[in-house]
């Protein structure tokens, strides 16, 4: 089987590379940049919009819960910030392995393999989600151990049980998004997300304000908002929207699960270490003395930074698709060029936002607060916010290159060293020992991100893209299944 798949893939890659090279030779640099930019934005724009919409669902829920009462708001915030973000990081990270598999298979025109990879990822992520469930079931003791007050924990335990159902939405959400992104078909996700956000506002008002159902109403609307786009995505994938890449359910999805799990695990490590890093910033600053105003200002800065991260994560998705597609095609120059265009596009946006936030300084805080003291503190922190935005315009893109090329295991070790062995210790020293408080912790963590970005930049610049194509070819050969074995696998065995 491997030999047959290898010969087929090698022949296909040779043909595609030759054709791609001839086409590229006839184009000038401006035309190449324009064509690559269009391919990049086809994936990036819907991805960015989808992430804003999904983030908006949580903000809408938070707003309505805040009108129920301060205890409910505190309980909602802690469960979403600590529990859901923890599971979200694990599942998003593990799902990113699908980007490598689907992207390279699509580039190599092994279209039938995308559906098999998708189903394997469903199995792996569903098993992982079940393993995470005890965190939500026993959320009470966990939150008490983190120092939360009893009256908040009592409400948080109820919300945590609702989050179990929301947690399972991440399985089809992340996998179907990546499956569609690999084919540049993710516009449908953006449309559905926009409609869902509007409906969520209406249902939240109806259940929380009009019928006064409290937390039950807010969480019911949130659950519907999380599940609705997933149902549409699943119907789109399985009902004819992806005829070339979805050939039906197959028993082959249950084979070769261990290699998929290992790749998913390394991907999970890479992404988790990044997502949890920002959460640790909040935990560390929360223990500083006399830092109430600074922490309020930090919360505003983190919210602004989170919104900018939606753009960066959109480019992460786009460049991972472009790099994996070109490697699958056997086009090393295309993968390299896609990386360059993505980095410079994202960096250009980051530079604009960098100067905007340096200019706005404390004025941005009045969107969130009327406190003059908090505004002054935001102005003091604004240079750090601006540099965070600048670094976040490059670092996620390089992580996207790693996903597209399948370097997740290496980047996980880089993240561990730069973030947790370098950034956090430096932040602790500057914040607690030197006495720089919140600024010191943030400077230390920015230092970790800067070092990580430098390492990833050097790693990308020194990449032998021809060798990377050979590695991708070997991976494709290892995973490939002849189409004849895939077709109607379940029905034939029955």
UniProtKB/Swiss-Prot annotation:
Topological category with respect to the lipid bilayer: Multi-pass membrane protein
| Pfam families, A to Z | MatE
User: What keywords sit in the KW lines?
Assistant: Membrane, Transmembrane, Transmembrane helix, Transport
Q: Tell me the CDD domains matching this sequence.
A: MATE_eukaryotic
Q: Write out the transmembrane intervals.
A: 40-60, 78-98, 123-143, 159-179, 188-208, 217-237, 268-288, 299-319, 340-360, 384-404, 416-436, 441-461
Q: Which GO terms describe its biological process?
A: xenobiotic detoxification by transmembrane export across the plasma membrane
Q: Which GO terms describe its cellular component?
A: membrane
Q: Is the keyword Membrane in the record? A: yes
From the Swiss-Prot or TrEMBL record, what is one GO molecular function term? xenobiotic transmembrane transporter activity
InterPro entries according to UniProt? MATE_euk, MATE_fam
Q: Does the keyword Hydrolase apply?
A: no
Where does it localize? Answer: Membrane
Q: Which PANTHER family match?
A: MULTIDRUG RESISTANCE PROTEIN
Fetch the NCBIfam families from UniProt: matE
Query: What does the sequence similarity comment in the record state about its family?
Result: Belongs to the multi antimicrobial extrusion (MATE) (TC 2.A.66.1) family.
Q: What is this protein called in UniProt?
A: Protein DETOXIFICATION 22
Gene of this entry: DTX22
